[in-house]
Amino acid sequence: MPLASQSAVSILCSLATMTSSMNSARIISRLGTGKVTAFSTLLTAAALLGFSFSGSFWFMCLMAIPLGLGAGCVDSALNNYVSIHYNATVMSFLHCFYGVGVMVSPYIMSVVINSAVGWRGGYRTASLIQALIGSILLLALPLWKKAHGEESIQAEKKMKVLPISQTLRIPGALMTCLLFLTFCAIEVICGGWSATYMVEAKHMSANLAARATMYFYLGMALGRFLSGVAAKKLTPWQIIFISMGILGVSQTTLLVSGNNVLTMAALLMTGLGVGPLYPNFNYMTPLHFGKDVSQSVMGMQMTFASIGTIAAPALCGVLGQLLGMGIFPAYLMIFYVLTAVGIIALRRTLRQVGRLQQ
């Protein structure tokens, strides 16, 4: 399939993800987090199975829609549920497994693709794994009520479902959404373009460049794991400040380093620094905006995160083609500065309305 066609499928999937995230509060208030999690997982399993039988570009576009719809709603649902019912440690560990999945899943897919079953078998394997998880979640639906009582089920049904404009008018909501755009942009830019930067600008071998990208994802998983451990002693804001400090050092190192080893270390540190931001900002959503509207805000946070993951790497590719991939460190630094400025602005707004958590 041509690269342009692949991009179209990815964009369709991302648009479906954003649509699902924006409507997550309405869906969850009707079905509940347990059913949304189970059905979304099964929906993605069906979409992956559809990909494996695809014989045309248009059918792949069609399958991208349920894949995105399932991914968007479950992300928003679980983030809000964990932030309300569990502590910051659980939230960080939850997202730590995302980093583990990002590292392990390409290896599993490559093994299957290189076997006799080919790429179709790879998608069927992924679909089977999702279907098994979805089936377990379906069987475990009664446990949701037992875990936190009937009160939590009723609270979900009574949550406020706000329109987009009203959600973004909540003091601090727009700024926290923009923060999700900027630091998620750092994640996907590093994951998508670091290897190209290492090869084209640093003249590194393709194998070594791929390893550097793996170091970034390793750092992200490790950062979220350490965030979960540190959450027992530190507040989310303290962890965010430490993470931003690490991220600042790593971005400066990327800008000035002429040494490949230092550059690879900087990518590891970038993952270590950016990793804790996503779970900790998610965890503070009900604390900053209230449990009654947190699902609406959470859905918009996931939407802006999706915008960042689509637009930022695409713009990086365009700039890299026009100016060369040497712009990679400076491009990342711009998003780091925007994140730092956004954090200052968010804290000022929350302090003014008396909702800032220490």
Write out the residue ranges for each language-model feature.
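Helix-breaking motifs and short loop linkers at transmembrane-helix boundaries and internal kinks
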Residues: 32, 53-58, 203, 235, ...
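Residue-level signature of mid-helix packing/kink "hotspots" within the transmembrane helices
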Residues: 13-22, 103, 217-225, 309-310
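Interfacial helix-cap and linker-helix signal at transmembrane-aqueous boundaries
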Residues: 27-28, 108-117, 198-199, 230-231, ...
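Cytoplasmic helix-loop-helix junction between adjacent transmembrane helices
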Residues: 63-97
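Conserved MFS/SLC helix-loop-helix module at the cytosolic interface between two early adjacent transmembrane helices
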Residues: 19-58
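Helix-to-loop junctions at the C-terminal end of transmembrane segments
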Residues: 20-33, 223-235, 320-321
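Symmetry-related core transmembrane helices of the 12-TM Major Facilitator Superfamily/SLC fold
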Residues: 121-142, 329-345
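Extracytoplasmic gate region of multi-pass secondary transporters
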Residues: 171-214, 218-221
